[in-house]
Design a protein with these regions (language model features):
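Short C-terminal tail/terminal secondary-structure segment
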Residues: 2-7, 106, 232, 243-264
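Catalytic loop of short-chain dehydrogenase/reductase
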Residues: 102, 148-170, 175-184, 196
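C-terminal helical subdomain
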Residues: 2, 191, 210-242, 249-251
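Alpha-helical segment proximal to the catalytic Tyr-Lys
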Residues: 137, 180-184, 240
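Canonical Rossmann dinucleotide-binding motif of NAD(H)/NADP(H)-dependent dehydrogenases/reductases
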Residues: 9-41
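Substrate-binding pocket helix/loop in short-chain dehydrogenase/reductase
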Residues: 105-109, 113-118, 212
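Active-site loop of short-chain dehydrogenase/reductase
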Residues: 14, 62-64, 90-92, 139-152, ...
Length: 264
């Protein structure tokens, strides 16, 4: 799944929407899809950053790429953004749900109020539900419909952060159920579960991620491009007989377990 010229063009003619594509993993996904020949739409609450990401895209259809504003916690915003993307691209073949995160700071359980739980569920679970619902009619019209959502290793093992972990585990349950329901439409639904990735959250300067390196059997934390490669694989025809599954992209951390500290 690593980058390579042999993969170039495998998304030629495909229309891809990356939700949460302005920064980090989302921006890497947008770049990977564009490099592999797709027309790419980048949706993000920060539309200026989304436009900056689109301007950097390189690929055969780069001139047709578009940035749109989307607040995934607001159904009307999601519906309007997807409609704008479909109007611009002429349809939709792939939905990559990358947006989400955890801003709780991992407090003790008793300090997590209902509002925090609701915010984490809205951001990390219901947002993806909204985007899938809005995209579904257009994915049904595609011959290559695929949904790939970014979950977390927190959904698979206890690394801390119960609200975030519960939301990401819920996303995996949605993935399995929709894979079954959408199979008759030819739509595949899968997810990836990253470990710690070097993004703005974990310190792009390397300080925070260096402190966590010891937790990973492969000796490093992930890069956004590691996750983008897995997302692109699951969205591609190379995974045409894979649906309803979650692919850990975690440097082997699930083999070792939580150990000291927590992950995000």
């Amino acid at each position: 799944m690593s980058g390579g010229t042999e993969m170039a063009g495998r998304f030629h003619g495909r229309r891809v929407l990356v939700v949460g594509g302005a920064h980090g993993i989302g921006a890497a996904c947008a770049a990977r899809f564009a490099r592999d020949g797709a027309q790419v739409a980048v949706a993000d609450l920060d539309v200026e950053a989304a436009r900056a990401t689109v301007e950097k895209l390189e690929g055969s259809d780069a001139g047709q790429d578009v940035a749109v504003q989307m607040d995934m916690t607001d159904r009307s915003s999601v519906d309007a953004a997807v409609a704008e993307v479909v109007e611009h691209l002429g349809g939709l073949d792939v939905l990559a749900n990358v947006a989400g995160g955890d801003d709780t700071g991992y407090p003790p359980f008793e300090d997590l109020d209902d509002e925090t739980w609701a915010r984490m569920l809205d951001w990390n679970l219901l947002g993806a539900v909204r985007t899938i619902r809005a995209a579904l009619p257009h994915l049904r019209a595609s011959d290559h419909g695929a949904v790939v959502s970014v979950s977390s290793v927190n959904a698979l093992m206890a690394f801390g952060g119960p609200p975030y972990s519960a939301a990401k585990l819920g996303l995996l349950a949605v993935t399995k159920n929709l894979a079954t329901e959408f199979a008759a439409d030819g739509i595949r639904v899968n997810a990836v579960a990253p470990g710690t990735v070097r993004t703005r959250v974990w310190g792009e300067d390397g300080k925070d991620s260096e402190q966590m390196r010891h937790m990973y059997p492969l000796g490093r934390v992930g890069e956004p491009e590691d996750i983008a490669a897995a997302v692109a694989f699951l969205a591609s025809d190379d995974a045409s007989w894979i649906t309803g599954h979650t692919l850990p992209v975690d440097g082997g951390v699930l083999l070792r377990g939580p150990g000291p500290g927590t992950l995000g």
